[in-house]
Amino acid sequence: MVLEVRDLVAGYGQSTVVHGVTLAVETGEVVSLLGRNGAGKTTTLRAIMGLNPPRSGRVTFKGGGISGKRPFEIARLGIGYVPDDRRIFPDLTVQENLELARRMSGRSGRWDVGRVCELFPVLTDLLGQKGSHLSGGEQKMLALGRALMQDPELLLLDEPIEGLAPLVVAHLGEALRRIREAGVTILLADQNVKFCRRIAQRAYILEKGLIQFEGTMAAVFENEALLSKYLAV
């Protein structure tokens, strides 16, 4: 078991958003965390990553507790995080963004600038461009590349295809399949169930901060009532 979350409670200020979430991700899986906007997907990922420390519950990574650790400590253990707002450095070049991610992580291994560019060939000709000059899709590729430069064993992805053109979505889907084949486990939070169906094996459905369903992606699509009630498909 690479990631286990038990009875997670988290929120912002006086507001509790996640009310006792329990989920698990096995090594080598792609697992989707599905739900509408406001369901608690982002809060769950931020709590796992230590950005919004859990109020209660337990998060373990490869059997060791990480609740209460700071985000940079969690990253150095081998968890990469790609937020929905990308969070690249706009005044640094693409190459500088990638190399800085490696230096800050304190990890080294399978991923370097060349391998990231093999995964996202469009970045090859943009290595000297500042992050602020990239399109939304290019920034998303760079954000994912930055996470990979930290040599993660687990990737947390928050709404990776939101607002992107269909061609870019297709490319990112293929990239995620290749990342999984390279041995990286993925927990993907998204509301696009059709995209998740193409790359994920299992799913959790989150609604109002509670897990409402756990099962295979095939089981999600076989249950029209489930899709209608929680995913508005």
Question: What is each of the regions a protein language model found here?
Answer:
Residues G57-I66, L77, G109-D112, E118:
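Conserved ABC transporter NBD signature motif
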Residues L155-E159:
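Catalytic Walker B motif of ABC-type/P-loop ATPase nucleotide-binding domains
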